[in-house]
Amino acid sequence: KQEAQAAAGLSSPYIVGVYDWGKDGDTYYIVMEYLRGTDLKSGIKSHGALDPKKVAQIGSQISSALSVAHKHEIIHRDIKPQNIMVLPDGNIKVMDFGIARAKNSHLTQDNNVLGTAHYVSPEQTRGQDLGPTSDIYSLGVVMYECATGRVPFDGDDAISVALKQVNELPIPPSQINSGVDADLERIILKCMEKDPANRFQTADELRQVLNSYLSGRAVNVSEPTRIIGAAGDLGATKTRELSDSTRAMVRPVSGVSGQNTARSAVSGSTGSYEVEKPKSNKNKII
């Protein structure tokens, strides 16, 4: 109910409309806008890397949607191509506002980090408080995949991918796709900075930069961080420190399946990671 009400309050041409919610017996439901189109992930699989201007257009529209949500103190927490619908006219709609928590309600929120490992921010993996910059990181990963045709970090399971989000730097997109120009590359990599303080601080700021890029105006974005400290492997307790942020451990959730719990608990690359318990978050996370 709470998530549906929050989603219903979001009005944007780039957010799937939520019209109503209700309960039928023991089942809650949400009445949402019907859309024709395909999800962005399927489009990337079919066509590969997108034109840089198209990447920026998609990024700008997602930024616009996130700006509306963030002004309502709502963090999406699951920005990924599967949650982006591409309409027949080429515009996009961000989906799953208001139902991400419902989908994962069988998993504990307090001591586990939930999210799709390929797109999750380092602080989400660590179980730290989330703000708008967490969604901006995930959007950066989406734009990276649009620009190159592949995700920046991959691995055998969700845990290994999540650790790479924390401990490794992405290959610059232009080294994968020579068609990616320096301006777009800097924008993408600034979104994906490990330290949230080094990213774009608001979705509006990112949108304005992307719109400048689309219009051919000068883009003033600093060079990305290319130095990272050493980090422990999966079984270690040592992780690199980001500025003055709190150190946190990332390790598989122990349980019936032992080390494979994270892999068996959920499908695909959506993982459950046990971390140090985060402080309370002022923002609503849906």
Q: Regions from the language model: what does each represent?
A:
Residues 118-221:
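C-terminal lobe helix-coil module of Hanks-type protein kinase domains
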